[in-house]
Curated annotation (Swiss-Prot):
PANTHER family: TRANSLATION INITIATION FACTOR 5A FAMILY MEMBER. Gene3D superfamilies: 2.30.30.30, Nucleic acid-binding proteins. Pfam families: eIF-5a, IF5A-like_N. This is Eukaryotic translation initiation factor 5A-2. Belongs to the eIF-5A family. Its main location: cytoplasm. GO terms for cellular component: cytoplasm. The modification Hypusine is found at K54. SMART domains: eIF-5a.
Length: 161
């Protein structure tokens, strides 16, 4: 038997090879959908279309909120142009511990541990910390990932055992 510990190696951060974005025609985008604006993944909060002018296509004006920073971004593009739409994934993790501002999380399905996410430096982070310290049930945090970024964007207490 060799001393190689191949089963100790974990490659959880590897990219599946799937694209982080996909193209979608500007005129097909809708409010509450996601879109990339200035290289950031955003949720569309407002859209308006201007009529076709004598110099070309109808224009679509979008107002969107960055899903990670909550900053408001705007873009105007011809309705026939393609825009990048980020692939946004949401997962729930069980909060096991909060250590030095980082969350120790466990996937409730696979039991895999995740220790690389910072507790948000906002009111949301304080709410999660308070719920965890009250110990009234399991705290589940919602982790959103897009374009290689991840952040905790929500939480709830699960009282079922």
């Amino acid at each position: 038997m060799s001393d190689d510990h191949h089963d100790d190696e974990h490659f959880h951060t590897g990219d599946s090879g799937a694209a982080a974005t996909f193209p979608k025609q500007c005129s097909a985008l809708r409010k509450n959908e996601h879109v990339m604006i200035k290289g950031r993944p955003c949720k569309i909060v407002e859209m308006s279309t201007s009529k076709t002018g004598k110099h070309g296509h109808a224009k679509v004006h979008m107002v969107a909120i960055d899903i990670f920073t909550s900053k408001k971004l705007e873009d105007i593009c011809p309705s026939t142009h393609n825009m990048d739409v980020p692939v946004v994934k949401r997962r729930e993790y069980l909060l096991m511990a909060i250590d030095d501002g980082y969350c120790s999380l466990m996937d409730p399905e696979s039991c895999e541990q995740k220790d690389d996410l910072k507790l948000p430096d906002t009111e949301l982070g304080q709410q999660i910390r308070d719920a965890y310290e009250k110990d009234e049930g399991s705290v589940l945090v919602q982790v959103v990932s897009a374009i290689g970024e991840e952040a905790i964007l929500g939480w709830k207490v699960s009282t079922k055992e």
